Amino acid sequence: MNNLLSIEQLTGDEIRDLLALGHRLKAERGHHERLPLKGQTWALIFSKSSTRTRVSFEVGISELGGRPMFLSVHDIQLGRGEPIKDTARVLGRMIHGAAIRTYGQQEVEEFASFSGIPTINALTDEEHPCQILADLLTIEEIYGPGSWKDMKIAFVGDGDNNMSRSWMWAAKRLGFTLAIGAPTNYLPLEDFRRHLDCENVIFTTDPVEAVKGASVINTDVWLSMGQESEGLSKEKHFYPYQVNRELLEHAASGHSVFHCLPAYRGKEITEDVLEHFAPVIFREAENRVHAQKAVLATLADARRG
């Protein structure tokens, strides 16, 4: 593995290896830590605002012995129109790796292609691979190693956003059952479904059907960054998909609710449900550190060869 650009690019074995390493690095935190990034500088190139992604990467890089360098696109020449390939070729001669949080998937892929250094997708409009790895890590902590393979996982809300797409690719690679519950116009198009080609991913417009028997129920904001102008015109379609007590009555016994945060209480999730599952949701956020440390360490080891 030379880059992490999407869950799609990974094999099932690579995902399992990253999860195992994430568990190990979390257990070792504060003692017997590896320093695979010692002497290295990693850039965090962000076009979008961030709390969890920025902090978790800065902490993870530092704990692995490296130096994080935060670069907002508004502070570098990318923000003034310099081509990505030029920025990539410059930084590739100066730093050891980069995590990029931006809009278009093609931007991350172009940077990786031209920089020649390990590149991590820290979120695009198409995928959010680091969050999915953190979520899978959290599932294993709650239910046991590899427990996802025997469970149904549900995602309700916008069925065609970066989180739902990354969940679909994880289901494809790992073989668990995934139900996507979303309004008709917010389910993936047929072209994507044909490309995915995965019988264990179920699409439905019925939120109850999606959640029925699910051990893990995921949701996300209805308006992703950059979609704020759509406002009420988009939100009105999603209220039947709100994660609330009534919907969760159809989930499996012992279920958990996941949210990648930030959450808008009273919209995609009710206040009482979020607070009830806060220990899970905020563990999920913490595990961004450990999942990303696993990615960083794996990329550094591959680079050394």
UniProtKB/Swiss-Prot annotation:
Q: Please tell me where L-ornithine binds in this chain.
A: N162, D220, S224, M225
Disulfide pairings: none
> Which InterPro entries has this protein been placed in?
Asp/Orn_carbamoyltranf_P-bd, Asp/Orn_carbamoylTrfase, Asp/Orn_carbamoylTrfase_sf, Asp_carbamoyltransf_Asp/Orn-bd, Orn/put_carbamltrans, OTCase_ArgI
Entries under PROSITE patterns matching the protein: CARBAMOYLTRANSFERASE
Keywords for this entry? Arginine metabolism, Cytoplasm, Transferase
The Swiss-Prot or TrEMBL record annotates one GO molecular function as: amino acid binding
The catalytic activity of this protein is classed by the Enzyme Commission as: 2.1.3.3
Q: Name one GO cellular component term.
A: cytoplasm
Subcellular localization is given as: Cytoplasm
Q: Which Pfam families does the entry mention?
A: OTCace (PF00185), OTCace_N (PF02729)
Catalytic reaction equation(s): carbamoyl phosphate + L-ornithine = L-citrulline + phosphate + H(+)
GO biological process: one example: arginine catabolic process to ornithine
Q: What EC class does the entry list?
A: transferase
Q: Which residues bind carbamoyl phosphate?
A: S50, T51, R52, T53, Q77, R101, H128, P129, C130, Q131, C260, L261, R288
What pathway or pathways are given for this protein in its record? Amino-acid degradation; L-arginine degradation via ADI pathway; carbamoyl phosphate from L-arginine: step 2/2
Q: Which domain of life is it from?
A: Bacteria
Q: Which family does it belong to?
A: Belongs to the aspartate/ornithine carbamoyltransferase superfamily. OTCase family.
The record's listing under HAMAP family reads: OTCase
Q: What does this protein do?
A: Reversibly catalyzes the transfer of the carbamoyl group from carbamoyl phosphate (CP) to the N(epsilon) atom of ornithine (ORN) to produce L-citrulline.
What is the protein's given name?
Ornithine carbamoyltransferase
- Gene designation per UniProt: arcB
